[in-house]
Amino acid sequence: MDQLVQFVEPARQFAKDSYRLVKRCTKPDRKEFQKIAMATAIGFAIMGFIGFFVKLIHIPINNIIVGS
């Protein structure tokens, strides 16, 4: 019986902590959501431009090396 309690107790504690965390969480309001969405969009745009410029630089270098 002691082994069963030892096996089940961590799962029970995890479920209790998870339930408490979910009860404390709140949804962001419209202003906070827009701020997060804007920051994410700017991040995607910056990463896209970096990838574009890296590819733009590597295409001529690759053509010079391969010599097509």
From Swiss-Prot:
Residues 1-32 are cytoplasmic. Keywords: Endoplasmic reticulum, Membrane, Protein transport, Translocation, Transmembrane, Transmembrane helix, Transport. The chain crosses the membrane at residues 33-61. InterPro entries: Prot_translocase_SecE_dom_sf, Translocase_Sec61-g, Translocase_SecE/Sec61-g. It is found in: Endoplasmic reticulum membrane. It is a single-pass membrane protein. PROSITE patterns: SECE_SEC61G. Residues 62-68 are extracellular. It comes from the Eukaryota. GO terms for biological process: intracellular protein transport; protein targeting to ER. GO terms for molecular function: protein transmembrane transporter activity; ribosome binding. GO terms for cellular component: endoplasmic reticulum membrane. Heterotrimeric complex composed of SEC61-alpha, SEC61-beta and SEC61-gamma. Component of the ribosome-associated ER translocon complex. Belongs to the SecE/SEC61-gamma family. Necessary for protein translocation in the endoplasmic reticulum and multi-pass membrane protein biogenesis. PANTHER family: SEC61 GAMMA SUBUNIT. This is Protein transport protein Sec61 subunit gamma.
